UniProtKB/Swiss-Prot annotation:
Top enzyme class: transferase
Functional description taken from the UniProt entry: Catalyzes the phosphorylation of 5-dehydro-2-deoxy-D-gluconate (2-deoxy-5-keto-D-gluconate or DKG) to 6-phospho-5-dehydro-2-deoxy-D-gluconate (DKGP).
Pathway: Polyol metabolism; myo-inositol degradation into acetyl-CoA; acetyl-CoA from myo-inositol: step 5/7
Catalytic activity entry: 5-dehydro-2-deoxy-D-gluconate + ATP = 6-phospho-5-dehydro-2-deoxy-D-gluconate + ADP + H(+)
Record's protein name: 5-dehydro-2-deoxygluconokinase
Documented EC number(s): 2.7.1.92
Keyword vocabulary terms for this entry: ATP-binding, Kinase, Nucleotide-binding, Transferase
Alphabetical GO biological process terms: inositol catabolic process
Family to which the UniProt record says this protein belongs: Belongs to the carbohydrate kinase PfkB family.
SUPFAM superfamilies documented for this protein: Ribokinase-like
Organism of derivation: Geobacillus thermodenitrificans (strain NG80-2)
CDD domains associated with the record: KdgK (cd01166)
Alphabetized GO MF terms: 5-dehydro-2-deoxygluconokinase activity; ATP binding
Organism domain of life: Bacteria
């Protein structure tokens, strides 16, 4: 049984909606932000990273979003174009908005934090009029992320995109991407996350993100109950990530899969979820068994957290396969030591 019936006749493989911003990653690692003086600039934002990851894997990819009318906005659009992503629905906002900035602090491989500047950002100016039914109709799948739900009019634009996707048989992925600093209250957050999740075919998030969505529910912190809740709506697959302990995928048909964990020379922890999503979605779109899709997602995540950047480090298919082969070849040698 094919859980996700992708329409192979559609010309676009993948469209992402939402956040386009700038990551400024600390060059001086192993020190606090107060002592960091230089940063390297990259394109950032979870949906942007996932779209870049999909394009690197050879998928025909498009993006729907807004960027600021400034140098940073132009940098983002050109970067997407350079990676073969269709930017015909990336709009330059003329309202005086700014590009969102994320400064990353890398104190140690496991102690990383992000300082966000999100006031009056262009990506949250996305309007329903920016969402075109004919464009979404052409895609096999659509990705939304939670940050775009944080404020109007972006919130309404996302729900319109969901409506068009459901109308035209477009498979919908929801990357939860919860960022508390963009929301006004826990009640608002839970309400809109739940309303969006009800319309999605695949939901991917951390245990903590699902806990946020379930904060008013009777049962919490139970992966199986979490998955079953969404199977009562449209969801076919729910993936719950547990950080260094790996991920678990549940299907509406009652299957459970525990994901592979790969070693990594960790530079920073952020970016793992975005690269995992790209590898996992790519596998599902190619009709792979869920465990194989999870394996490629985990391998992509290990590659990215071993790198300084997120978007620049999104791997190609060859890089993922070489990484997996290298790790599997090394394991027998380790077992004989």
């Amino acid at each position: 049984m094919n859980l996700l019936p992708f329409d192979e006749q559609k010309p676009l493989d993948f469209i992402a909606v939402g956040r386009l911003c700038i990551d400024l990653n600390a060059n001086e690692i192993h020190r606090p932000m107060e002592e960091t003086v230089t940063f390297t600039k990259y394109v950032g934002g979870s949906p942007a990273n996932i779209a870049i990851g999909m394009a690197r894997l050879g998928m025909k990819t498009g993006f729907i979003g807004r960027v600021a009318d400034d140098q940073m906005g132009r940098f983002i659009v050109q970067y997407l174009k350079n990676n073969g992503i269709d930017t015909s629905h990336v709009i330059t906002d003329k309202s005086g908005s700014v590009t969102g900035l994320a400064f990353t602090e890398i104190k140690s491989p496991t102690d990383c934090s992000i300082l966000m500047y999100r006031d009056n950002v262009a990506d949250l100016k996305l309007e329903p009029n920016d969402i075109h039914e004919d464009y979404i109709r052409q895609a096999k799948c659509l990705l939304i992320s939670g940050t775009a739900l944080a404020k109007s009019p972006s919130r309404e634009a996302v729900f319109l995109a969901l409506e068009y996707a459901r109308r035209h048989g477009v498979v919908v992925f929801f990357d939860l991407d919860y960022r508390p600093y963009t929301w006004q209250s826990k009640e608002e957050t839970a309400i809109y996350y739940n309303l969006a999740a009800e319309k999605c075919d695949v939901i991917i998030g951390t245990r903590e993100e699902f806990d946020m969505m379930e904060q008013f529910a009777v049962h919490q912190h139970d992966d199986e109950k979490t998955a079953q809740k969404w199977f009562d709506y449209h969801a076919k697959i729910v993936v719950i990530k547990h950080g260094k302990d790996g991920s678990i995928a549940y299907t509406k048909t009652g299957e459970t899969f525990v994901g592979t964990i790969f070693p990594a020379n960790i530079v920073k922890t952020f970016g793992a979820g975005d690269s995992y999503a790209a590898g996992f979605i790519y596998g599902l779109m190619n009709g792979w068994p869920i465990p194989k899709a999870m394996e490629y997602g985990a391998a992509a995540a290990s590659i990215v957290i071993s790198s300084h950047s997120c978007s620049d480090a999104m791997p190609t298919l060859d890089q993922i396969e070489q990484f997996i082969q290298h790790i599997k070849a090394a394991r027998p040698l380790q077992n004989h030591k």
